[in-house]
Amino acid sequence: MKVFKDVFTNDEVCSDSYVQQDPFEVPEFREIAFEVKSNKRIKGNEDYGIADNSEDAVEGMGADVEHVIDIVDSFQLTSTAFSKKEYSAYIKNYMQKVAKYLEEKKPDRVEIFKTKAQPFIKHILTNFDDFEFYMGESLDMEAGIIYSYYKGEEITPRFVYISDGLFEEKY
């Protein structure tokens, strides 16, 4: 299994167990980002009622049960908020950091990143109110932000990652 980690904080933010797709169904964005679908799962109430054969056992299930989004729960992501102005300042700084990282580690990616990042960020800013933002476990603002949005009538969000801000680690 591959785990995707933030290049600046080592936060684990995704894995290859999620099928990667074109962000926002825009194939050009795939060169710098990827999108994955999340699922809801039930967490808690680990008492499976093995010793309790009564009909009342079903009633006891609700108290400790919580519905969670699998990616948020598995990678301990935390929701964060930005105004459009705050996000603009953050993303400008972050893109410069990623470009510098690429110059040092993957120089062949620098020009692609700089060219493709502009329309991607423009899409985020144009649709800003449709997004929720998440941070990795460290809650470090130097890390990449993970974008979440709901597509159509889906009941769970999709998550979008800037791939040049991540590295893969095999387990």
Swiss-Prot record:
Keywords: Calcium, Cytoplasm. Gene3D superfamilies: Metal Binding Protein, Guanine Nucleotide Exchange Factor, Chain A (2.170.150.10). GO terms for cellular component: cytoplasm; food vacuole. Residues 1-171 form the TCTP domain. It is found in: Cytoplasm. The keyword Kinase does not apply. GO terms for molecular function: calcium ion binding. Involved in calcium binding and microtubule stabilization. Belongs to the TCTP family. This is Translationally-controlled tumor protein homolog. It comes from Plasmodium falciparum (isolate 3D7). The gene is TCTP.
